[in-house]
């Protein structure tokens, strides 16, 4: 028996559309990260970018459980002395770029390195219900029906 190793030329990428409305952030991010890496495919090869292209819409309607909506903090540093900054998940979701919550959650579930950066380029997140990828004919994936814990009605 020989271990299967897929070549980059053999990769077939599909387009997946996920509606994030009322979905739990961590559960959504886990599913998206696995789709981006290609771990759902029987032809998964760790060193090849064989994941799908994922489109997430309604990112501003994602749900955080518990007190994370008000208490979870995202930190960054400006580079200056004493330049540590923070924002809560609520400030980001109600701000100009609510899609960054999903991007950051998925980014932290993808391996760091050149392959991880290439896989992150296959993720498109939009705050509203409109997206410019109709020509790719994305296949809708209903994450809420996969597991009852994936969806929260607020």
Swiss-Prot record:
Keyword Protein transport: no
InterPro entries: Ribosomal_uL13, Ribosomal_uL13_bac-type, Ribosomal_uL13_sf
Domain of life: Bacteria
GO biological process: negative regulation of translation; translation
GO molecular function: mRNA binding; structural constituent of ribosome
Chain segments annotated as coiled-coil in the UniProt record: none
Annotated region (Disordered), positions in chain: 129-154
A Pfam family this chain is assigned to: Ribosomal_L13
Parts of the chain that traverse the membrane: none
Ribonucleoprotein recorded as keyword: yes
Entry's family note: Belongs to the universal ribosomal protein uL13 family.
Subunit structure: Part of the 50S ribosomal subunit.
PANTHER family in the cross-refs: LARGE RIBOSOMAL SUBUNIT PROTEIN UL13M, RIBOSOMAL PROTEIN L13
Protein's UniProt name: Large ribosomal subunit protein uL13
Lineage, uppermost ranks: Bacteria, Pseudomonadati, Pseudomonadota, Alphaproteobacteria, Hyphomicrobiales
